[in-house]
Amino acid sequence: MQYGDQTTFKQSLAIQGRVINALLMREIITRYGRKNIGFLWLFVEPLLMTFFIVMMWKFIRADKFSTLNMIAFVMTGYPMAMMWRNASNRAIGSISANLSLLYHRNVRVLDTIFTRVLLEVAGASIAQILFMAVLVLIGWIDAPRDVFYMLMAWFLMAMFAFALGLIICAVAQQFDVFGKIWGTLSFVLLPISGAFFFVHNLPSQAQSIALWLPMIHGTEMFRHGYFGDTVVTYESIGFLVVSDLALLLMGLVMVKNFSKGIEPQ
């Protein structure tokens, strides 16, 4: 194929795949290096964070406050919240770290953001699967009731993480101070993300307010898949899908608008 020739859709997909793969490899090597366990930190890092939280709940014997398995409760809330929080935090620095690569005509601003979010989602997903499998094997938690429903919830929240990453990156690109304080703001959002409570346990007025937050629907859905009908959940798949698509569209438009002013260095 000569330079300037029109590519087919299949060729464009192949090119896009190579671009994403190259950016992923560069990001992994840059972030984790080639020594010691290298890219294994991709999922060891979120796994360790979750491990410390689970052990804390285990040894304070949180089960005595509820008939619910509190380790399972933590495992079905905290890792998912950390996925979208970490993804949005990492998205902020994606452009500055890859400015020199934007000279290549096949590398776009959107690619750099997508790569970072994809890494965070992949790491969180692997850590979640491995840790839950280990906890089931050693008998600390029961096997999930509906794995497919849990996978659906995880996928929808991964989409939310990508959409949020686009929006946060775009806002931080326009206002530097926002990029510096988002880490703190996102940490403040954790208590209201549904990671540490069931909507059913809230007062009715608080329930109606909480259900306007997309991440609460994702957490409720994930927990419904794990606990089954033993718990009462209030998720709306339709609301979560519409919210994801709306946020994704908003994020794509915002990134497209500010990308025009990005100059490679």
Curated annotation (Swiss-Prot):
One of its GO terms (biological process) is lipopolysaccharide transport. It comes from the Bacteria. Disulfide bonds: none annotated. It holds the Pfam family ABC2_membrane. One of its GO terms (cellular component) is ATP-binding cassette (ABC) transporter complex. One of its GO terms (molecular function) is ABC-type transporter activity. It is a multi-pass membrane protein. It is found in: Cell inner membrane. Its main location: membrane. May form an ATP-driven capsule polysaccharide export apparatus, in association with the BexA, BexC and BexD proteins. This is Capsule polysaccharide export inner-membrane protein BexB. It comes from Haemophilus influenzae. The gene is bexB.
